[in-house]
C-alpha cells in the first residue's frame, strides 16, 4: 500500500536515526512521483508540518548522513513544487544557513547546491538573499565564510542583474574586519566577484565605506588583477549597482567605455601614491613591527590571535557569571601559574566569541575585571602581558564604545609598557593602544594620551603623538570638541619637542587637527615662531604622498565616508579619456614626484570685482601667494591633486613665476582650452567627460547659468580671469583670499567635482545638477538653484549665507536605495550639499563642528542608549546630523531607535538632554513618518503626558511643536482612534493638565479630520462618555471648557454619526451632552446665524460630500430631510415649501421621496445653505431634541456603510403610500399647521430631532417608527403608522392590544423611579418578565430600546434585589429576542460584566447567567471583538467573567472565523495566563483548550512566548479534554517549548 501524507509526516517526525536513514530514499522517491503523492499539493497544512519537520529535525541533525538525506528530500520537494515552495523558504533558510558552517565539506557543498536550486526554481535570488543577510553576522565563522561563498556562486549562476547588491555590500564590508582570516579572505573574494560583474562602480563605492586604507589597497590591487586578466563580465545593462548615492556621480554613465580603457597601472599608482599615513593602517603597523626586531608583534598577529582560542559554550547568564568569576579569581592572584593566567585571558576571548556580550550581566562583570587586567598588564611574564594586550584589543574591537570604562582604566598601565626594553611587551602595548583608539572613541581617552605626550621617555612621546595622529584620523569631530584646547596645546608642545621624530609626528597631528578645527589650527599656526611655521609648510611641500596631509582630502562635513576616505577614491573611478589632452603651451612636468598644487586662493567675489580693481595683491594682503599663505588658509591647504596626469587626463603644467619670484606649477584645465567652443565651461577645473557636460555636447542650454555670461571669443574676455567657482586658472593679477575670509569656493556653472577637492562646493555643479548627457542627450538647466549661480557676485556677508540656505532647501531623498535607482546625477546624494561644511564656514568657524554626519548609525544608537547623559546628548547630536543629511534608517535601526526614544521620554536631564531629544524627535518624525505607524501610540501618548509635566517654558514649547508635527504627519483617523483608546485606558490616570492637553489635541484634530475619520466604535462611545463626565470636572474649569469644546467639535465634524453615538449612551450622558449642544446651537444662532460652528472656529470649507451627505442619516427619510431647495442651495421660495418642525410626538409628517433626486444629484452637490437660517427656525427645531436623542435607535457602522457602498447614498425608506413621488410640500398631521416658506433646518439641528428607525422584520427593517416613547404613548394614531410604510408590510404589523401598550407604558414609568419605590419597581420588573415571555411583537418594536436602557440603568440601583431582578429580565429578553441586541451588544456586554463586581452573590450569580446567555445569543464574531479589549485592560473579576464568556463563544464559532480572530484573542489570554489570580489563569487555560479543540495545531505558532512549564500544563489540559470528549484517539500535542 502506498504511503499517504500522514504516514510520510510520521516518518519525518520520528527520532530514530536508523529508521530515518532507511525511509529517506523512499520519501525522495515518493515526493518525486506525482501520481503517488498527488495530495502533496492540496494539503497545505500537512506540507507545512512536513517541511518544518525536515528543517528542524533532519537538516539540523547531529548525524551528517541524516542532514544530507534531509537536504535531498528538500531538493526533491523544490523540484516537485517549483515556485509553490516559495512559501516554505522562510522555514528552511535558518537551518540551511546554519549548515553552511557544518564541519563536513560534503554537507556545506550540498547546502550550497540546495540554496542555488531554491534561487533557481522556487524564488528569485533577491527574495532568498533578503532572508539570508543575517548569516553575515552568524556566530559560526564557517557560516560567515559560507555565506560569502554562496554569494559568489549566486553571482556566477544568476548574474549580478538578479541581486540588489547595495543591500549586501555593507555586510561584506563588515566582514573585512572579521577576527577570522578565512572569513576576511572570503569577503575580499566576494567583493572581487562583485567587481568582476559590476565594474568600477564597486571601487568608488568601497572608497566611501570608511574602510582602512590598507584593506582598500589590498582589495583594489585584486580588482586591478582581475581587470588585467580579462575576466571582467560587466554588462552595460547592469543596473543593480548603478550610481547609488555613494558612487561618484561625476563619471560617465555605465554605457561609456572609458571605465575599462584607463590603464590599470596608473590606477594602481594612484592608489598607492595616496596611501594614508602608515601609523593608521595594518600595513603600516606591520612594517613598523618589522623594524622593531625580533619579538615584535603587530596588529595582524593580534587579529590572528583573537580567535585562536578554545571553543566554549555559554548556556545561561549564570554560567557566564561563574566563568568570569573564576577568571577574575585567577587573574587577580599573581601567585597562580602563569600558564593558568594565560589560559584565563584566552577564555575571556572565547566567551566573547561565544556571544557573552549579548548577556546583560556581562558588562557588570567586565568592570570587575579592571583590576585583574591591570595586574596582568604589569606582569613580569611577557606571555601574560601579550595575552592581556590581545584580550584588551579584542574587547575593544568587539564592544566598541561599550568598552569605555575598561579602556579608560587600563590605558595608563599600557602606556607604561611602551618604553619596555622587551620588544614583545612594548609592541604589544602599542598595538593594544592602537586597537583601542580605532574602536573605542571615548573623549575621556584624550587626556590620558595627551598627558603622556610630555613624558620623560622619548619613546613614549613619539608613540603618543603617533596615537594622537591616529586618533585625529579615525575619530569624528564631535568626539574631539570637548578637548580642543588640550589638543592644540599638546600639538604645540610636540612641534617644539626636543626629539626630531616626535616633532615630525606632531606636525602630522597638526594637519589632522586642522581638518577638524581649522580656526583653532590657524590660531595655533600664528602663535608659532616663523621657523616652526616654515617647518610645517615644508612638511606639506615635501610630502610625496599624502602622509603629511592625511585630512586635506577629507571633508570635515558630516559623513563617515568622507572622514575616513582614502585619497585614491578621489579620482574618477572610470578614469579619463586620453583624447582630451590639452593644447595649451606647456613646460615639462616637475619630476620630483611631489604633488603639484595649483593656485586656488581666488575668492569668487574678488574675481568678480577685479574688473574694476586690477592691482597686484602682494602689497595688500599678507599672504598673496599659495606659498606664503598660512596652512590654515584655503590656498595653502589647496586642491591636492592625485596625479591625474598619469591616467591620461591630463592637463599640461606650465610654470609661471608668481609675485615672489617662486615658480609655481600651473595646471590648466582641459575646459579652459575649449573656452570659445564652450563658453559655459570656461574656468572649469574638471577634465572628466562626465564633468565637462558642456564641452563635448555643444554646451549647456540657455538659461542654465545665471551668472555673468562668458563671451565665446577669447579676445572679448576681460583681462581679469573670471573665477568659475572652482576654477584652477591662475594669474598674478588675481587677488588672494584673505585669511579671515569664510567664503567657500562654491562650484558655479562648472564642475568642481568631489575628486578635485573636498573643499569645494559639492552640490551645485552641472555635473551633479544634470543627468549624464550621453544618456539623455540634453541637460536640464532647471535643476540648478538660481541662488547658487548668483553666488558669484554675492558679498561675503549674509547674502551668501542666505543663498546657501536657499540652495539647501532640497526635497528629501532616501539614501540607501538599491543600486540602480539613481542616475549619474548625484546632486541629491548624501555627499552633496551646496557647499560642504569644510568649504562653508567650518574652516573659520562658520557653523558648529558637530554638524557632521556621524560615522556609524550603530554607534549613534549606542550613544543614545547610554546611561551617561553627556553621551546621550552626543548621540542625539549625531542623530540630528544623520537626519539632516537625509540618511534614512533601516527597519531594525528604526525599531531600536523607537525603543530608545520611548525611554528618553522619561529622561531626567530635561534641560540638557530632553530638550535636544525633542528637537531630534521632530526631524525624526518628519523623515520617517511613513514607518512609524506602529510607534504612534507611544509617541502621541508620551507627548501628551509631557504636556502635563512641570517643564520649562522653552521645553514645553518644544513638546507642543512635536505634537503639532505629529498631528500633521500621521493619518487623522489613526490618531483619533489612539486618543480614544488612551482616554478609556483604565491603566492611565491623567492629571488635569494632561486632560486639557488631550482635549485640545482632539479639538485641533477634529478641525482637520474628514467626517469619515470619525468612527462610531465601542471605544469611541466609551471615550465620549468619559469626555462628557469631564464637562463637570469639579477641580478645573480648563478641563470643563476643553471637554465642552471637544464635544461641540465632534458634533460639528460628523453630526449624523455623533448623534447616533449619543443615542447609544445611557440617559445621564445623553442629557449632559444634549444640554451642552442646545446651548451651543442657541449661542451660535445669537452670535451668527451663518453656522453653528462659529463658536469653535470651524471652517465651512471642511464640508465634504462624505461628511455632509444627508442621505447617511435617518433625517433624510423624516421631516428633517433635505428638500430640493436644500440640494440646490436655493431659497425656499424658489422651489418648494419644506416640512414643518416636529411639533408633537404624535404628528407624523410624510417624508418626500428623493428617488428622482437620487438619480440626478451626486453627493458633491449636497452643500447646505447654512447661511439662511434664523433663530426662530433653530428654536423650532429644538423642541423634541432630548426625546429624540433618548429614543434614537443606534445602528451599527456596518448598517450605515452598507447602502453607501452600494450607490453612494442612503436609501430613503419612507415613500408615499401610492408609491409615487411625494410633493415637497408637506401635509399637516395631527392638527399641526405647516408654516409656509421656511427653509430646511441645518443638518446638525435636524439630526438632533431624528426619530428612532423601526426594526420591522423582513426587508423593511429600517422603516421609521415615528412614535417615541413619552407620557402620551397611549394617544398614538394607528392609522398614521400604516400610512408611513409600504402596503405589503401591513400584514407584518400586528395589532398590539391597547391594554398591553398601556401596561408597558405604566411599567416603564415605574421603572424610571430610580432608587425609589423599591417594592413597586420589583413588581414592575416581575410583570415585565412575564411580558418578555409573550409574543408581543408590536410592543417590543416600539419600546425595546427604552426598556433596554432602563434595565441597564437599573443595574446601578441601590437595592441588590432590584439589580438581580433586572439582570434576570435582561437574560429573559436575550433568550427570547436575541436579534434585537445586535446593535446594543457592546453596551449590554459591558454592563453585564461590570455587574460581576457586585458585592452581593445573588447579583453576581444573575450576572453570570446573563453573561452565559449573552455568549450564546449574540453573534460570536461580534461578541469576541467586544470581549478582547476588555480581557486585556479590565481588572479582576471583570477579566475573569470576560474570559469565561469568551470560552463559551469559542465553543460555537466556526474554525475559519476563529482563525481570523486569533491575533486579537491570544494576547489577552496569554496575559491572563500570567495573572496573579489563579482563577483568571485557570480560565485562560480553559479558553486556550477550547480554542485548540476548534482549530487544533494552528494554535501552536501563537504560543511561542509561553514557557516550558506553562506549555506542559496546557498540554495536560488539552489531553484531558480530548480524553473526556473522546474526540480523538491520538493525543495531539502542541509542540513543547523549552
Swiss-Prot record:
Residue stretches of biased makeup (Polar residues): 645-658, 724-733, 1082-1097
Residues in coiled coil: 1299-1330
Superkingdom of origin organism: Eukaryota
UniProt region (Interaction with microtubules, MAPRE1 and MAPRE3), positions on chain: 662-785
Annotated positions of the Phosphothreonine modification: 656, 711, 1095, 1099
Intervals holding HEAT repeats: 87-124, 163-200, 405-440, 441-477, 974-1011, 1342-1379, 1460-1497
Keyword hit for Repeat: yes
Gene Ontology cellular component annotations, sorted alphabetically: basal cortex; cell cortex; centrosomal corona; centrosome; cortical microtubule cytoskeleton; cytoplasmic microtubule; cytosol; Golgi apparatus
Interaction with CLIP2, as annotated region: 1254-1538
Region Interaction with PHLDB2 and RSN, annotated ranges: 1254-1538
InterPro entries: ARM-like, ARM-type_fold, CLASP_N_dom, HEAT_type_2, TOG, XMAP215_CLASP_TOG
Function: Microtubule plus-end tracking protein that promotes the stabilization of dynamic microtubules. Involved in the nucleation of noncentrosomal microtubules originating from the trans-Golgi network (TGN). Required for the polarization of the cytoplasmic microtubule arrays in migrating cells towards the leading edge of the cell. May act at the cell cortex to enhance the frequency of rescue of depolymerizing microtubules by attaching their plus-ends to cortical platforms composed of ERC1 and PHLDB2.
Subunit structure comment from the entry: Interacts with CLIP2, ERC1, MAPRE1, MAPRE3, microtubules, PHLDB2 and RSN. The interaction with ERC1 may be mediated by PHLDB2. Interacts with GCC2; recruits CLASP1 to Golgi membranes. Interacts with MACF1. Interacts with mtcl2 and MTCL1.
Protein name: CLIP-associating protein 1
Protein source organism: Homo sapiens (Human)
Gene behind the chain: CLASP1
Amino acid at each position: 500500500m502506498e504511503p499517504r501524507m500522514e504516514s510520510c509526516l510520521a516518518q519525518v517526525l520520528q527520532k530514530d536515526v536508523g529508521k530515518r536513514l532507511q525511509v529517506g530514499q523512499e520519501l525522495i522517491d515518493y515526493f518525486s512521483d506525482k501520481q503517488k503523492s498527488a495530495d502533496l499539493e492540496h494539503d497545505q497544512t500537512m506540507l507545512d508540518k512536513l517541511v518544518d519537520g525536515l528543517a528542524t529535525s533532519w537538516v539540523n541533525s547531529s548525524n551528517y548522513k541524516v542532514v544530507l538525506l534531509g537536504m535531498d528530500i528538500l531538493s526533491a520537494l523544490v523540484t516537485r513544487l517549483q515556485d509553490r515552495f516559495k512559501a516554505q523558504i522562510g522555514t528552511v533558510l535558518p537551518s540551511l544557513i546554519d549548515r553552511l558552517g557544518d564541519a563536513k565539506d560534503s554537507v556545506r557543498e550540498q547546502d550550497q547546491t540546495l540554496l542555488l536550486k531554491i534561487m533557481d526554481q522556487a524564488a528569485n535570488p533577491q527574495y532568498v538573499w533578503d532572508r539570508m543577510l543575517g548569516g553575515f553576522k552568524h556566530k559560526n565563522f564557517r557560516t560567515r565564510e559560507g555565506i560569502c561563498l554562496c554569494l559568489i556562486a549566486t553571482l556566477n549562476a544568476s548574474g549580478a542583474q538578479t541581486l540588489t547588491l547595495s543591500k549586501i555590500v555593507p555586510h561584506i564590508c563588515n566582514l573585512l574586519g572579521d577576527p577570522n582570516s578565512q572569513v576576511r579572505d572570503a569577503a575580499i573574494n566576494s567583493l572581487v566577484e562583485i567587481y568582476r560583474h559590476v565594474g568600477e562602480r564597486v571601487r568608488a563605492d568601497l572608497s566611501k565605506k570608511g574602510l582602512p586604507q590598507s584593506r582598500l589597497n589590498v582589495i583594489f590591487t585584486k580588482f586591478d588583477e582581475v581587470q588585467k586578466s580579462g575576466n571582467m563580465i560587466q554588462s552595460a545593462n547592469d543596473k543593480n549597482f548603478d550610481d547609488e548615492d555613494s558612487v561618484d556621480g561625476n563619471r560617465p554613465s555605465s554605457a561609456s567605455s572609458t571605465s575599462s580603457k584607463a590603464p590599470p597601472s596608473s590606477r594602481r599608482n594612484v592608489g598607492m601614491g595616496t596611501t594614508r599615513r602608515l601609523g593608521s593602517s595594518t600595513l603600516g603597523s606591520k612594517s613598523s613591527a618589522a623594524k622593531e626586531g625580533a619579538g615584535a608583534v603587530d596588529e595582524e598577529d593580534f587579529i590572528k590571535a583573537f580567535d585562536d582560542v578554545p571553543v566554549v559554550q555559554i548556556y545561561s547568564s549564570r554560567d557566564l557569571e561563574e566563568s568570569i568569576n573564576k577568571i577574575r579569581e585567577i587573574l587577580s592572584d599573581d601567585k597562580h601559574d602563569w600558564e593558568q593566567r594565560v589560559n584565563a585571558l584566552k577564555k575571556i576571548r572565547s566567551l566573547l566569541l561565544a556571544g557573552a556580550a549579548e548577556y546583560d550581566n556581562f558588562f557588570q562583570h567586565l568592570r570587575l575585571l579592571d583590576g585583574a587586567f591591570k595586574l596582568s598588564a604589569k606582569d613580569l611574564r611577557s606571555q601574560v602581558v601579550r595575552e592581556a594586550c590581545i584580550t584588551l584589543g579584542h574587547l575593544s574591537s568587539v564592544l566598541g564604545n561599550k568598552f569605555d570604562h575598561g579602556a579608560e582604566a587600563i590605558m595608563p598601565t599600557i602606556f607604561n609598557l611602551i618604553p619596555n626594553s622587551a620588544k614583545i611587551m612594548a609592541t604589544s602595548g602599542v598595538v593594544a593602544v592602537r586597537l583601542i583608539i580605532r574602536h573605542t572613541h571615548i573623549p575621556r581617552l584624550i587626556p590620558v594620551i595627551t598627558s603622556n605626550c610630555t613624558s620623560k621617555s622619548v619613546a613614549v612621546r613619539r608613540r603618543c603623538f603617533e596615537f594622537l595622529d591616529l586618533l585625529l584620523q579615525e575619530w569624528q569631530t564631535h568626539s574631539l570638541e570637548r578637548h580642543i584646547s588640550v589638543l592644540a596645546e599638546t600639538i604645540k608642545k610636540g612641534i617644539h619637542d626636543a626629539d626630531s621624530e616626535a616633532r615630525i609626528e606632531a606636525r602630522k597631528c597638526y594637519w589632522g587637527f586642522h581638518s577638524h578645527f581649522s580656526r583653532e589650527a590657524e590660531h595655533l599656526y600664528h602663535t608659532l615662531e616663523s621657523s616652526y611655521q616654515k617647518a610645517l609648510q615644508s612638511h606639506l611641500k615635501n610630502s610625496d604622498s599624502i602622509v603629511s596631509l592625511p585630512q586635506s582630502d577629507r571633508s570635515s562635513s558630516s559623513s563617515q565616508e568622507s572622514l575616513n576616505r582614502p585619497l585614491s577614491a578621489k579620482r574618477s573611478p572610470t578614469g579619463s579619456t586620453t583624447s582630451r589632452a590639452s593644447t595649451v603651451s606647456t613646460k615639462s612636468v616637475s619630476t620630483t614626484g611631489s604633488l603639484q598644487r595649483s593656485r586656488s586662493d581666488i575668492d569668487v567675489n574678488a574675481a568678480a570685482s577685479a574688473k574694476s580693481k586690477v592691482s597686484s595683491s602682494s602689497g595688500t594682503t599678507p599672504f598673496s601667494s599659495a606659498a606664503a599663505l598660512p596652512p590654515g588658509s584655503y590656498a595653502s591647504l589647496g586642491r591636492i591633486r592625485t596625479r591625474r596626469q598619469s591616467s591620461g587626463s591630463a592637463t599640461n603644467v606650465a610654470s609661471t613665476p608668481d609675485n615672489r619670484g617662486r615658480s609655481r606649477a600651473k595646471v590648466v584645465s582641459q575646459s579652459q582650452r575649449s573656452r570659445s567652443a564652450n563658453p559655459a565651461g570656461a574656468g572649469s577645473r574638471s577634465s572628466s567627460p562626465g564633468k565637462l557636460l558642456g564641452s563635448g555636447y555643444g554646451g549647456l542650454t540657455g538659461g542654465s547659468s545665471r551668472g555673468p555670461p562668458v563671451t565665446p571669443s577669447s579676445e572679448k574676455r576681460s583681462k581679469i580671469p573670471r573665477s568659475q567657482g572652482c576654477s584652477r586658472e591662475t594669474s598674478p593679477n588675481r587677488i588672494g583670499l584673505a585669511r579671515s575670509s569664510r567664503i567657500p569656493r562654491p562650484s558655479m556653472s562648472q564642475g568642481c567635482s568631489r575628486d578635485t577637492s573636498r573643499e569645494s562646493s559639492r552640490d551645485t555643479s552641472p555635473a551633479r545638477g544634470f543627468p549624464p548627457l550621453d544618456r539623455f542627450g540634453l541637460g536640464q538647466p532647471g535643476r540648478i538653484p538660481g541662488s547658487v549661480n548668483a553666488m558669484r557676485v554675492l558679498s561675503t556677508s549674509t547674502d551668501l549665507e542666505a543663498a546657501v540656505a536657499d540652495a539647501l532647501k532640497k526635497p528629501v531623498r532616501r539614501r540607501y536605495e538599491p543600486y540602480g535607482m539613481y542616475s549619474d546625477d548625484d546632486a541629491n546624494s548624501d555627499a552633496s550639499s551646496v557647499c560642504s561644511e569644510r568649504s562653508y564656514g567650518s574652516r573659520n568657524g562658520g557653523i558648529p563642528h558637530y554638524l557632521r554626519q556621524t560615522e556609524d548609525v550603530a554607534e549613534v544608537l549606542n550613544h543614545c542608549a547610554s546611561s551617561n547623559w553627556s553621551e546621550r546628548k552626543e548621540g542625539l547630536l549625531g542623530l540630528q546630523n544623520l537626519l539632516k543629511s537625509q540618511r534614512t534608517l533601516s527597519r531594525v535601526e528604526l525599531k531600536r531607535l523607537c525603543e530608545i526614544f520611548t525611554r528618553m521620554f522619561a529622561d531626567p536631564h530635561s534641560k540638557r538632554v530632553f530638550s535636544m531629544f525633542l528637537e531630534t524627535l521632530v526631524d525624526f518624525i518628519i523623515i520617517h513618518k511613513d514607518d512609524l505607524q506602529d510607534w504612534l501610540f507611544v509617541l502621541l501618548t508620551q507627548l501628551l503626558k509631557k504636556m502635563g509635566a512641570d517643564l520649562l517654558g522653552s521645553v514645553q514649547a518644544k513638546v507642543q511643536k512635536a505634537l503639532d508635527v505629529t498631528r500633521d504627519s500621521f493619518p487623522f483617523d489613526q490618531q483619533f482612534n489612539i486618543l480614544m483608546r488612551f482616554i478609556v485606558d483604565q491603566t492611565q490616570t491623567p492629571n488635569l493638565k494632561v486632560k486639557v492637553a488631550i482635549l485640545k489635541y482632539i479639538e485641533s484634530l477634529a478641525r482637520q479630520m474628514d467626517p469619515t475619520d470619525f468612527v462610531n466604535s465601542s471605544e469611541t462611545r466609551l471615550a465620549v462618555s468619559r469626555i462628557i463626565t469631564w464637562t463637570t470636572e469639579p477641580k478645573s474649569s480648563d478641563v470643563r471648557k476643553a471637554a465642552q469644546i471637544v464635544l461641540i467639535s465632534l458634533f460639528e465634524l460628523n453630526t449624523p454619526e455623533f448623534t447616533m453615538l449619543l443615542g447609544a449612551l445611557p440617559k445621564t450622558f445623553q442629557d449632559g451632552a444634549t444640554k451642552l449642544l442646545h446651548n451651543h446651537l442657541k449661542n451660535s444662532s445669537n452670535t451668527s446665524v451663518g453656522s453653528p460652528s462659529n463658536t469653535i472656529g470651524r471652517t465651512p470649507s471642511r464640508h465634504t460630500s462624505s461628511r455632509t451627505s444627508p442621505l447617511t442619516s435617518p433625517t433624510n427619510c423624516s421631516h428633517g430631510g433635505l428638500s430640493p431647495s436644500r440640494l440646490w442651495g436655493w431659497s425656499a421660495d424658489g422651489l418648494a415649501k419644506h416640512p414643518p418642525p416636529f411639533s408633537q410626538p404624535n404628528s407624523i409628517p410624510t417624508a418626500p421621496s428623493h428617488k428622482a433626486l437620487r438619480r440626478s444629484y451626486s453627493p458633491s452637490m449636497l452643500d447646505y445653505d447654512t447661511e439662511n437660517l434664523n433663530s426662530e427656525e433653530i428654536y423650532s427645531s429644538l423642541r423634541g431634541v432630548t426625546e429624540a436623542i433618548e429614543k434614537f435607535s443606534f445602528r451599527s457602522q456596518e448598517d450605515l456603510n452598507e447602502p453607501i457602498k452600494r450607490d453612494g447614498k442612503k436609501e430613503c425608506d419612507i415613500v408615499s403610500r401610492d408609491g409615487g413621488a411625494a410633493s415637497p410640500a408637506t401635509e399637516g398631521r395631527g392638527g399641526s399647521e405647516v408654516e409656509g416658506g421656511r427653509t430646511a433646518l441645518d443638518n446638525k439641528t435636524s439630526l438632533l430631532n431624528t426619530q428612532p428607525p423601526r426594526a420591522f422584520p423582513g426587508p423593511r427593517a429600517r422603516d421609521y417608527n415615528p412614535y417615541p416613547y413619552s407620557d402620551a404613548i397611549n394617544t398614538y394614531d394607528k392609522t398614521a403608522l400604516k400610512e408611513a410604510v409600504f402596503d405589503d408590510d401591513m400584514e407584518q404589523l400586528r395589532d398590539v392590544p391597547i391594554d398591553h401598550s398601556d401596561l408597558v407604558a405604566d411599567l416603564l414609568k415605574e421603572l424610571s423611579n430610580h432608587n425609589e419605590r423599591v417594592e413597586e419597581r420589583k413588581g414592575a420588573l416581575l410583570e415585565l418578565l412575564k411580558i418578555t415571555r409573550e409574543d408581543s411583537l408590536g410592543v417590543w418594536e416600539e419600546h425595546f430600546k427604552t426598556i433596554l436602557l432602563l434595565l441597564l440603568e437599573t443595574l446601578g440601583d441601590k437595592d441588590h434585589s432590584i439589580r438581580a431582578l433586572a439582570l434576570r429580565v435582561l437574560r429573559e429578553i436575550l433568550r427570547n429576542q436575541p436579534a434585537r441586541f445586535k446593535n446594543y451588544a457592546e453596551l449590554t456586554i459591558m454592563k453585564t460584566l461590570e455587574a460581576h463586581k457586585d458585592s452581593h452573590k445573588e447579583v453576581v450569580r444573575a450576572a453570570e447567567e446573563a453573561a452565559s446567555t449573552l455568549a450564546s445569543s449574540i453573534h460570536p464574531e461580534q461578541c469576541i471583538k467586544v470581549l478582547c479589549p476588555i480581557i486585556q485592560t479590565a481588572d479582576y473579576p471583570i477579566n475573569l467573567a470576560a474570559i469565561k464568556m469568551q470560552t463559551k463563544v469559542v465553543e460555537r464559532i466556526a474554525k475559519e472565523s476563529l482563525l481570523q480572530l486569533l491575533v486579537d484573542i491570544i494576547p489577552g489570554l496569554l496575559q491572563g495566563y500570567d495573572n496573579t489570580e489563579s482563577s483568571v489563569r485557570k480560565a485562560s487555560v480553559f479558553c486556550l483548550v477550547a480554542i485548540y479543540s476548534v482549530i487544533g495545531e494552528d494554535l501552536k505558532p501563537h504560543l511561542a512566548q509561553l514557557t516550558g512549564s506553562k506549555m506542559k500544563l496546557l498540554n495536560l489540559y488539552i489531553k484531558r479534554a480530548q480524553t473526556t470528549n473522546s474526540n480523538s484517539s491520538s493525543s495531539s500535542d502542541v509542540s513543547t517549548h523549552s
